[in-house]
Amino acid sequence: MDVVEVAGSWWAQEREDIIMKYEKGHRAGLPEDKGPKPFRSYNNNVDHLGIVHETELPPLTAREAKQIRREISRKSKWVDMLGDWEKYKSSRKLIDRAYKGMPMNIRGPMWSVLLNIEEMKLKNPGRYQIMKEKGKRSSEHIQRIDRDISGTLRKHMFFRDRYGTKQRELLHILLAYEEYNPEVGYCRDLSHIAALFLLYLPEEDAFWALVQLLASERHSLQGFHSPNGGTVQGLQDQQEHVVATSQSKTMGHQDKKDLCGQCSPLGCLIRILIDGISLGLTLRLWDVYLVEGEQALMPITRIAFKVQQKRLTKTSRCGPWARFCNRFVDTWARDEDTVLKHLRASMKKLTRKQGDLPPPAKPEQGSSASRPVPASRGRKTLCKGDRQAPPGPPARFPRPIWSASPPRAPRSSTPCPGGAVREDTYPVGTQGVPSPALAQGGPQGSWRFLQWNSMPRLPTDLDVEGPWFRHYDFRQSCWVRAISQEDQLAPCWQAEHPAERVRSAFAAPSTDSDQGTPFRARDEQQCAPTSGPCLCGLHLESSQFPPGF
């Protein structure tokens, strides 16, 4: 027998021994098992979340009693929403109530509806049992799974007993998912996520909840556990932009100390949400995450950096993100309603600026499906991962067009900076003749002077102060200027000047004052070779226009 066969038989025997311990049940481990001893008297030592305390709990305070009464009163409202789910699943009321708090006895049915568990069970009858049996026979990570299960939610009454019922169910779920999704296989965080589902869902429902959570585009959690997932890079880039915009001093210190590239703070936050804070706050944040989707990750990151601003500016190179994790947990060990209030405010602010979601991922960023274009917050929240199109442009940014669109005849085509093409167009019958309406500044006779084929659509749902504003739908930081009256009157000047003068004006070298502007320096620094025309050079600055603009 060669070495490979010996190793294979040894792994098979080890796998069978681990499974046999879980089949025997409670206290079936070795004598040197260091797990906590069973604590059977749970009368006055268990809180309302199921956490077992070694000492007897004090009587309820007035605030805790008020919170329990409030949760009981909210139960009927959530039951009504579940009874008429088609009406409430896309409503603002669902989001508002999720931030206020989801009753514990409603959390299981609500999670099941949000993740479409029943639909998955109907589409895959008996598949969970098949995956579970295959995982028992061929799992390659069963030792890691067993080791992680021994430290998962051990203070909870469901998982306190080693090799108990809930630990056995957790083992089955993780083995089945390893077989179901070989790309992810098993990661340490999956044991904590599945354990949270097992607190409120049966075994098979918890498995399909885990499947939906990682497979749904709405939550995009697979990128944090898959080696080929493109979610992490997109969220990481967006996080760096959001934090750098709101906490410039903090990120400046991190860049100066070369701390930003040492560890991913976003992945660190995911682990904090799983097993780093109190169970009550963890459950409430997961409620919001399941309702809102991946939009909740950016606000949580922003809140963390905002709270830790003073401490992060004093962080040295010695374990920066380890300190960040510990201090984040200590800081947010406070009232849950306060945390959710700050989270809601941050969500509204980032959504208003379209900073809650990163731009669509490029094909080279991973094998995951292409990410949908982030929609405005004015849309309704969808529960099946579908996203509505962004709202149309409001009346604040009307595009100057003809009232009755006349036919147009192209005069000439001129290449312009950035690979765009400018077509000098006039209404048929008016080539070279100034329009009387244009001379008078009439709106119905105005059209755009420059027809940029690669110009992005203006983000018309932002609160704009001044003519310059960020466009968040593109990865490059492009600055676009709103259409001014001079742009509308441009054809009057164009009718009097040949096209050669227009080309020479755009081909003229930039002056020193142009190169010294912060917009030009910033865009030239961020401009990288990409597929398609580069948008970073499309500045409609005064120095680039011919005289008279």
UniProtKB/Swiss-Prot annotation:
Main location: membrane
Region (Disordered) location: 350-426
Keywords: Cell membrane, GTPase activation, Lipoprotein, Membrane, Palmitate, Ubl conjugation
GO molecular function, one term: GTPase activator activity
Keyword Thylakoid: no
CC per GO annotation: plasma membrane
Post-translational modification: Ubiquitinated by a CUL7-based E3 ligase, which leads to proteasomal degradation.
Start-end of Low complexity biased regions: 398-417
InterPro entries, per database record: Rab-GAP-TBC_dom, Rab-GAP_TBC_sf, Rab_GAP_TBC_domain
Gene3D superfamilies per the UniProt record, alphabetical: putative rabgap domain of human tbc1 domain family member 14 like domains (1.10.8.270), Ypt/Rab-GAP domain of gyp1p, domain 1 (1.10.10.750)
Signal sequence annotation: none
Compartment(s) where it occurs, according to its Swiss-Prot or TrEMBL record: Cell membrane
Sites of S-palmitoyl cysteine lipidation: 318, 325
UniProt membrane topology term: Lipid-anchor
Domain Rab-GAP TBC: residue ranges: 101-293
Other comments on record: TBC1D3 is encoded by a collection of very similar paralogs with multiple copies of each paralog, some human genomes encoding well over 50 copies depending on ethnic origin of the donor.
Annotated function: Acts as a GTPase activating protein for RAB5. Does not act on RAB4 or RAB11.
Name of this chain's protein: TBC1 domain family member 3B
The organism of origin for this protein: Homo sapiens
